Amino acid sequence: MRTFALLTAMLLLVALQPQAEARQARADEAAAQQQPGADDQGMAHSFTRPENAALPLSESAKGLRCVCRRGVCQLL
């Protein structure tokens, strides 16, 4: 009886192993997509104001840049 239970448990472990590996691979992919890193730098957008713009800027506002990443914009 113990041998049968042991063999059944081993068979279940062998049968479920590929499913566990597939889930782990999907979880690793999702984690890699969510982590900021070098990929975010490739998606960054930068906007600068041309010198001959219609509205003049004050001296303190000249040279400002807007850098946007994933919906978050910062003035530099």
From Swiss-Prot:
InterPro entries, sorted: Alpha-defensin, Alpha-defensin_N
Region of interest (Disordered), ranges: 24-54
Any Gene Ontology CC annotation: extracellular space
Covalent link Cyclopeptide (Cys-Arg) (interchain with R-65 in subunit A), residues: 73
Propeptide stretches in the record: 23-64, 74-76
Cross-link (Cyclopeptide (Cys-Arg) (interchain with R-65 in subunit B)) at residue(s): 73
Pfam families named in the record: Defensin_propep
Sequence ranges of Low complexity compositional bias: 30-44
Residues joined by cross-link Cyclopeptide (Arg-Cys) (interchain with C-73 in subunit B): 65
Cross-link position per record: Cyclopeptide (Arg-Cys) (interchain with C-73 in subunit A): 65
KW Disulfide bond (keyword) present: yes
Signal peptide boundaries: 1-22
Keywords: Antibiotic, Antimicrobial, Defensin, Disulfide bond, Fungicide, Signal
Disulfide bond positions: 68-73
Keyword Signal: yes
Modifications made to the protein after synthesis: Forms a cyclic peptide with subunit A (BTD-1), or subunit B (BTD-2). An additional intersubunit disulfide bond is formed.
Coiled coil: none
Domain of life: Eukaryota
GO biological process per UniProt: antibacterial humoral response; antimicrobial humoral immune response mediated by antimicrobial peptide; cellular response to lipopolysaccharide; defense response to fungus; defense response to Gram-negative bacterium; defense response to Gram-positive bacterium; disruption of plasma membrane integrity in another organism; innate immune response in mucosa
UniProt record similarity statement: Belongs to the alpha-defensin family. Theta subfamily.
Subunit structure: BTD-1 is a cyclic heterodimer composed of subunits A and B; disulfide-linked. BTD-2 is a cyclic homodimer composed of two subunits B; disulfide-linked.
Stated role: BTD-1 and BTD-2 have antimicrobial activity against the Gram-negative bacterium E.coli ML35, the Gram-positive bacterium S.aureus 502a, and the fungus C.albicans 16820. BTD-2 is more effective against E.coli than BTD-1.
Name of the protein: Theta defensin subunit B
Native species: Papio anubis
